[in-house]
Amino acid sequence: MAEILRAENIKKVIRGYEILKGISLSVKKGEFVSIIGASGSGKSTLLYILGLLDAPTEGKVFLEGKEVDYTNEKELSLLRNRKLGFVFQFHYLIPELTALENVIVPMLKMGKPKKEAKERGEYLLSELGLGDKLSRKPYELSGGEQQRVAIARALANEPILLFADEPTGNLDSANTKRVMDIFLKINEGGTSIVMVTHERELAELTHRTLEMKDGKVVGEITRV
């Protein structure tokens, strides 16, 4: 499989403390990679750098073979909106908007006609079992439903790579299974995924797991 993402010697220093200590890794097209580790191991910091939400102190990141310029905010914004999707532990839905409107926002931001954006939003929410709740606002949805809206929003612009930071952290076991089933289906469709989790049983569902400790990758398990 072709390489979609590569990181070389990533370091991150915050207030004199070295959070990441020279991490190198790659993600292939269609691969589902999990990153596990204790709290404070640096896994979320690494995910944010790979997802272009934060810049490394040192090191390079390549997306589809092209080096990312972290000093060019315009380019970063375009890459994030056109090629990447994000799902977080907290969904960050806009409370004043309906489920459908929340999903449409990133498409309109990229210039998609409103009719097309609405049709895709309806399709995504229906695929995620929310076809009857398009007009509900976040407070009218359960935690699991809110997270599914967030996943639909992350998929709105058909990303090549999806990043997930503890996406099931606030969910019960039934909703955790549902979200993971959705991720596996998305991955089977060809979207690469990088997921941070502290739950080893979830990591075991992925193609490859990287284990972090004290800002370093200390172990790797490949299942395929």
UniProtKB/Swiss-Prot annotation:
Where in the sequence is the signal peptide annotated? none
What processes does the entry annotate via GO biological process terms?
transmembrane transport
Protein species of origin: Aquifex aeolicus (strain VF5)
Where the record annotates domain ABC transporter, the positions are 5-224
Per the record, the similarity remark reads: Belongs to the ABC transporter superfamily. Lipoprotein translocase (TC 3.A.1.125) family.
Q: Does the keyword Hydrolase apply?
A: no
The protein, known as: Lipoprotein-releasing system ATP-binding protein LolD
Entry-linked PANTHER family: ALPHA-D-RIBOSE 1-METHYLPHOSPHONATE 5-TRIPHOSPHATE SYNTHASE SUBUNIT PHNL, LIPOPROTEIN-RELEASING SYSTEM ATP-BINDING PROTEIN LOLD
The protein's matches in InterPro entries, at most eight in alphabetical order, are given as: AAA+_ATPase, ABC_transporter-like_ATP-bd, ABC_transporter-like_CS, MacB-like_ATP-bd, P-loop_NTPase
Q: Which CDD domains match?
A: ABC_MJ0796_LolCDE_FtsE
Which regions span the lipid bilayer? none
EC number(s) from the headed UniProt entry: 7.6.2.-
Q: Where is the protein found, in the record's own terms? A: Cell inner membrane
